């Protein structure tokens, strides 16, 4: 009887303790995920088809599952378990205009915030039910590429304004960073890009230790009325005002597509660089908190390689980068995953997966078993596009 009471008391104390440890910030959520889910699974691998959808982003959730944002023609949000089985999904066809789920993040209240491309941000509860949405009402479309929740509960939205700046609208072609309140109200917007150049875009954003933001994107240069993309990393203060900027590129097409932050407040950014008009390489760069390039490398050889997403390993020893590749201009694209040493930028391993039609990977996250889960858009599994989800082990292998 004494022994039973002892364990009963321990159970009560454990319940009280767990009730007092409610995550109150984005970093708390991430720590909770690591603490409670790190023992799940053991190098589980699989390849799974989610029909009728395209997957653009994937994250780990605080209850040891995964959440995918994408498109069925409209935005879709899908919760899956660690084996790729659907738990629930939400679609948002009632929101007017074109929109698709470019990015998703878990919020401090257990819900999700979705960057839904054309002018749209969607906030949901923990099971994907819409709580509110915001349509950005400017003179031209503002394409939302990424959204994060700040440490104080607001949201930062980044992307690019569509259209040709020569058409007479000053905001067209500019990259933008926008701050929203917790309830979705726009507080301010700042736009960047050289005058008379189209399609400057911020593709990814993270919050810095000082409360500012570091952005990854593409910035166009006008040279004798010819436009060239540059790989672009920019730091702003908490109000979106520029503090430093890095541009890397020549007379071709270079883009920074995604970014992760390390614990020392440095950043690893990935995207693509052009070696010639027919040869693209994946590009990866590490940048200090003050904007100094610590290292940068290209990978791909003679292939056409583009990186679209990046995830940092829990121990910060490596990043896994995802994108797509093809061996020649006439061949179909295939998924490609790179493992890159975070200290040197050197390739540790690389894997290619694909069929006989176009397959492009866009989102990647480190899994709970230290493998990686990838989502994208595939046409190799039937006549219609599908979200082809690939779960690898820690070296990028699939059994």
Where are these regions (language model features)?
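A sequence-level/structural motif corresponding to short, flexible coil/turn segments enriched
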Residues: 21-399
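Sec-dependent signal peptide recognition
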Residues: 3-10
